C-alpha cells in the first residue's frame, strides 16, 4: 500500500495503519 507523502490528519494515519494490520493478518503474514 503506497502512502502519499502528504501531511495527513492523525486519525487518517491511524486508520491507515489499522487497515494495513488487518490486511497483513488476512494474508497472513
UniProtKB/Swiss-Prot annotation:
Family in the record: Belongs to the scolopendra toxin 8 family.
Expression by tissue: Expressed by the venom gland.
Protein name, as recorded: Scolopendra 8011.73 Da toxin
Subcellular location, record wording: Secreted
A GO CC annotation given for this chain: extracellular region
Keywords assigned: Neurotoxin, Secreted, Toxin
UniProt-recorded Gene Ontology molecular function terms: toxin activity
